[in-house]
């Protein structure tokens, strides 16, 4: 049986100096300043303050519907067309008694510091409109991309 199911990207949040801003999921804001699309449409338009944010998301992959979830093979983060982060789960090694991603400084404590979500990297947002894209790919080549449009003030 071949794997044709795309990975999932859910509960995306930006964590900054002023707190945590949900971009998707049940905690995403739905007010006059922004709107959140349903799961069928992935765009989110939200106002944020310029600065550096830590990006987290619940990313997962399954081989068959209703089976155990796994971490996707690779996750890429792109801001305004430029890749700002790439997390590859290809090889995990032990460093100082902790599991770390090979070729990365990310250990299990940093990678999973926000419960239920994976740290995808830091993003710098400057004034204007920003397009934030998160792409998750599994080992079979199935890929899903979620795109968020942000108004940075």
UniProtKB/Swiss-Prot annotation:
Superkingdom, taxonomy of origin: Bacteria
Entry protein name: Uncharacterized protein TP_0781
Organism of provenance: Treponema pallidum (strain Nichols)
């Amino acid at each position: 049986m071949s794997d044709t199911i795309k990975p999932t990207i859910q509960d995306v949040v930006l964590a900054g100096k002023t707190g945590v801003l949900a971009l998707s999921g049940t905690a995403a804001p739905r007010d006059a300043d922004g709107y959140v699309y349903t799961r069928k449409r992935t765009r989110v338009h939200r106002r944020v303050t310029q600065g550096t944010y830590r990006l987290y998301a619940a990313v997962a992959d399954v081989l068959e519907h209703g089976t155990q979830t796994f971490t996707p093979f690779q996750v890429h983060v792109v801001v305004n067309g430029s890749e700002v982060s790439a997390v590859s789960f290809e090889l995990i090694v032990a460093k100082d008694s902790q599991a770390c991603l090979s070729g990365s400084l990310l250990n299990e404590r940093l990678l999973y510091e926000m419960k239920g979500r994976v740290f995808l990297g830091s993003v710098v947002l400057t004034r204007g409109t920003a397009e934030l894209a998160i792409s998750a790919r599994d080992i079979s080549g199935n890929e899903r991309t979620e795109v968020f449009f942000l108004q940075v003030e």
